[in-house]
Swiss-Prot record:
This is tRNA-queuosine alpha-mannosyltransferase. Residues 199-227 are annotated as: Disordered. Keywords: Cytoplasm, Glycosyltransferase, Nucleus, Transferase. Glycosyltransferase that specifically catalyzes mannosylation of cytoplasmic tRNA(Asp) modified with queuosine at position 34 (queuosine(34)). Mannosylates the cyclopentene moiety of queuosine(34) in tRNA(Asp) to form mannosyl-queuosine(34). Mannosylation of queuosine(34) in tRNA(Asp) is required to slow-down elongation at cognate codons, GAC and GAU, thereby regulating protein translation. The gene is Gtdc1. One of its GO terms (molecular function) is tRNA-queuosine(34) beta-mannosyltransferase activity. Its EC number is 2.4.1.110.
Length: 445
């Protein structure tokens, strides 16, 4: 095995990426730690891996997420330190919002800076992630009382590049209501085009949004599903593997499908809003749920599905809102089965983000692929990914738009998304990751 993949936080998007890389690369070996107690993983994972990764003369490349303190690992294991070292940033700690800053929090961002200095290639999942990290280094280091290091941005920047997080969009045709079939056909067509030209288009520069394509043949000649199967099968994996589709289980689903499918083709049924994010303060559930409660007080008709993972400390607003929203709630809580999760997204009309912290946003793109109309803050990574039509500047603007949508849900259901999801697909990006990981290291590394 010539490629060592290390993931100190093996869950969520971190795990998704690693699993895709393992499918693409035969010549790799994976070492992981479970996705819990993030702060302890960031502090101590390097020592653990230094003792548990066996030595091998065949290793050529090391790939790790920025949770790992790469500097410590390279010092503890000089044999690993000599490899071509690739550091991938899903998020960065220099601009992470904390409830109450403590001096110990400095160490997390500092470790990421040190890891960049040791790495040979530093990869970010978005231009926003890269620029927010690099341009914050100077300000961040001013927290040091004296004898501060200098010029680190200029040292690190030449190593940096953007390769978007790759999403394997699954086969959702069997979940799609008829009014979304034209949308799905367009998504599959554009993903296929992106796969064919994956090595041509560069990632956008900071401040530049992913370019739009004019939809060709968006309107379908038929409202039937069968011909979607062949298109999807060809896109599940750029090579031969076809596990991108979601298996239909014979077991009883935790969700009752009739709850979602009943009246799915009624254009005047209540607007279905979904919020598919972690139940933590950095995703700002308070803003979202307070807006919904205000809509409820105005006697506006809507349904809501609040998805996403929950952890030990769940914000109090969730229990308060669930009670206040009452019969408007269709689903409340995390859906561990992917088919249940995508079923909800396909039946929903609008997907909302209220995040204070987002460097990519897998859940929003998955929902858009499933035909949801996105509403996102005009901040963070969102302007890089979504056209201006789908961005809001204030909670008041979000509330106003949702009020309008509640009154005319039929208009939203006729809407065809004007942006792109294709540049973020595994079909489009797998070649870039393969090239990154299989290119021979320079002789002077």
């Amino acid at each position: 095995m010539s490629i060592v993949i290390i993931e100190a936080f093996y869950g969520g998007s971190h795990r998704q990426l690693v699993e895709l890389l393992r499918e693409e690369l035969d010549d790799c070996v994976l070492y992981t730690l479970p996705a819990k107690k993030w702060h302890w993983r960031a502090r101590t994972a390097a020592l653990y891996f230094s003792q548990n990764i066996p030595s091998s003369e065949h290793y050529r490349t090391l790939f790790a997420s920025s949770v790992l303190n790469l500097t410590e690992l390279a010092a503890l294991r000089p044999d690993l330190g000599k490899l071509k070292k690739i550091l991938y940033f899903h998020e960065n700690q220099l601009v992470y919002p904390v409830k109450k800053y403590q001096e110990r929090d400095f160490q997390y961002g500092y470790n990421q800076i040190l890891s960049c200095l040791v790495a040979d290639v530093v990869v970010f999942n978005s231009s926003f992630n890269m620029e927010s990290f690099l341009t914050s280094i100077g300000k961040f280091l001013k927290l040091i009382p004296d004898h501060r290091p200098k010029d680190l941005e200029s040292i690190i920047r030449p190593k940096c590049q953007v390769i978007y997080f790759p999403i394997r969009f699954p086969d959702v045709s069997r979940f799609m209501p008829k009014h979304k079939i034209a949308h799905l056909r367009r998504m599959l067509s554009l993903i296929g085009d992106a796969a064919a030209s994956q090595s041509v288009a560069p990632c956008p520069q900071p401040g530049q949004r992913v370019s739009e394509k004019s939809p060709e043949n968006c309107e379908s000649k038929s409202d039937e599903h069968p011909d979607l199967d062949a298109e999807q099968e060809a896109l599940d994996n750029p090579s031969v593997h076809k596990s991108g589709s979601l298996p239909v289980s014979k077991e009883n689903l935790p969700l009752d499908p009739s709850t979602l499918l009943c009246g799915a083709e009624d254009p005047q049924r209540p607007l279905h809003i979904t919020w598919p994010h972690r139940w933590e303060h950095d995703k700002d559930p308070e803003t979202f749920l307070k807006i919904l409660m205000s809509l409820k007080q105005l006697n506006l008709n809507f349904h809501v599905s609040v998805l996403g993972e929950t952890f030990t400390d769940t914000p109090d607003i969730f229990s308060e809102a669930k009670k206040a929203l009452g019969s408007s709630v269709l689903h409340w809580g995390y859906l561990p089965r992917k088919e249940d999760y995508f079923r909800v997204l396909c039946m929903a009309d609008v997907v909302i983000s209220t995040a204070k912290h987002e460097f990519f946003g897998v859940a929003m793109l998955e929902a858009v692929y499933c035909g949801c109309y996105p509403l996102c803050p005009k901040a963070l990574v969102y302007p890089e990914i979504f056209p201006a039509e789908y961005l809001y500047s204030t909670p008041e603007q979000l509330s106003k738009r949702l009020k309008s949508f509640c009154k005319r849900p039929d208009i939203i259901r006729k809407h065809l998304y004007k942006g792109e999801v294709a540049p973020f697909s595994w079909a489009a990006l797998h070649g870039k990751f393969r090239s990154l990981l299989t290119t021979e290291p320079r002789e002077d590394l």
